[in-house]
Amino acid sequence: MKNISLLGASGSIGTQTLDVLRSHPDQFRLVAFSVGKNIDYAVKVIQEFSPQIVSVQREEDVLKLQAVSGNTKIVYGSEGLLEVALHPDAEIVVNAVVGSVGLLPTLRAIEAKKTIGIANKETLVTAGHLVMEAARKHNVSLLPVDSEHSAIFQCLNGENEKRISRLIITASGGSFRDKTRDELHHVTVEDALRHPNWSMGSKITIDSATMMNKGLEVIEAHWLFGIPYEQIDVVLHKESIIHSMVEFEDRSVMAQLGSPDMRVPIQYALTYPDRLPLSDTKQLNLWEMGTLHFEKMNQERFRCLRFAYEAGKTGGSMPAVMNAANEVAVEAFLQKRIGFLTVEDLIEKAMNHHNVIARPSLEEILEIDAATRRFVMEQI
């Protein structure tokens, strides 16, 4: 029986993580979780899983939950999030929160020698050097939950990582993969939220449409697998059947395939190095699929992917700036305050405005994050 703490239980990854726990009640126990403002959902999860600690975003929601929570301790805010991440009984902390708020809980959980199931891209994007240094220092495993990084992780099992020639990350292309840049001037929030292959939260769905999601994944892959950016490629693959590939020095390429179902990489992170049945996921049927398509990625068409490569290669504090600018811009787009292509413009402005710090401390990263958010808000 593995004890799990789940950060971000009400989001897309969080709800699917609970599906995995539900499928294997003899294997996993939920000891703590966090939610944002979805209190009704939190009540249902408490009643089903009887965790010891639950964290909510707002203090005013604590009393509401205490009234129905029985023996579950209710905490709130950033301190509450840390309490969930540091639950003494938790062996695995699944970080499924959205945004850079996931950074500090991840670092503290690593220091407490918890195994980390990392679904929060922004943690490695904003502070990859700090996170990987901490993981090495405390001998902690970072197990990828993203389908692409899980695919690479699985392809590398038993392999000599020094023999990697290239990582090939696949991208569905998102909601607007077939639109020209001229057409993108007129797209709506509702258009952007209709992803062709995956069911995800609103922020990551917009990131998929701008291709920033893939850019974040490139930076994340750089840190997780220690591969230079020059050896990380992105290829358009509309069907989302091949989740990513690894090319080795002898030009052999290993790929991980499967139907699009996020529960598969989530479960693998929880069961690694073992596997368990996931009987209700769709079996891959290649002869029904017939043809798989691949296209070269155009970084002028998808400018956010280019920004991510530039930020990653620049290094230091630049990825944190790019990420903070993106979070603010995406939120403004979701609120219909800016157009779709303005997201790119705001990110570019923030990156051009920033003076890079080569090896920022945690405090500097948090300060830069806040300053970038203020700068972008002033531009809107």
Swiss-Prot record:
Coiled coil: none annotated. GO terms for molecular function: 1-deoxy-D-xylulose-5-phosphate reductoisomerase activity; manganese ion binding; NADPH binding. Pathway: Isoprenoid biosynthesis; isopentenyl diphosphate biosynthesis via DXP pathway; isopentenyl diphosphate from 1-deoxy-D-xylulose 5-phosphate: step 1/6. SUPFAM superfamilies: 1-deoxy-D-xylulose-5-phosphate reductoisomerase, C-terminal domain (SSF69055), Glyceraldehyde-3-phosphate dehydrogenase-like, C-terminal domain (SSF55347), NAD(P)-binding Rossmann-fold domains (SSF51735). InterPro entries: DXP_reductoisomerase (IPR003821), DXP_reductoisomerase_C (IPR013644), DXP_reductoisomerase_N (IPR013512), DXPR_C (IPR026877), DXPR_C_sf (IPR036169), NAD(P)-bd_dom_sf (IPR036291). GO terms for biological process: isopentenyl diphosphate biosynthetic process, methylerythritol 4-phosphate pathway involved in terpenoid biosynthetic process. 1-deoxy-D-xylulose 5-phosphate binds at residues 121, 147-148, 172, 195, 208, 213-214, 217. The keyword Manganese applies. Pfam families: DXP_redisom_C (PF08436), DXP_reductoisom (PF02670), DXPR_C (PF13288). Its cofactor is Mg(2+); Mn(2+). Its EC number is 1.1.1.267. NADPH binds at residues 10-13, 36-38, 120, 122, 201. Keywords: Isoprene biosynthesis, Manganese, Metal-binding, NADP, Oxidoreductase. Mn(2+) binds at residues 146, 148, 217. The keyword Oxidoreductase applies. It catalyses: 2-C-methyl-D-erythritol 4-phosphate + NADP(+) = 1-deoxy-D-xylulose 5-phosphate + NADPH + H(+). Belongs to the DXR family. Catalyzes the NADPH-dependent rearrangement and reduction of 1-deoxy-D-xylulose-5-phosphate (DXP) to 2-C-methyl-D-erythritol 4-phosphate (MEP). This is 1-deoxy-D-xylulose 5-phosphate reductoisomerase. It comes from Bacillus cereus (strain AH187). The lineage of its organism: Bacteria, Bacillati, Bacillota, Bacilli, Bacillales.
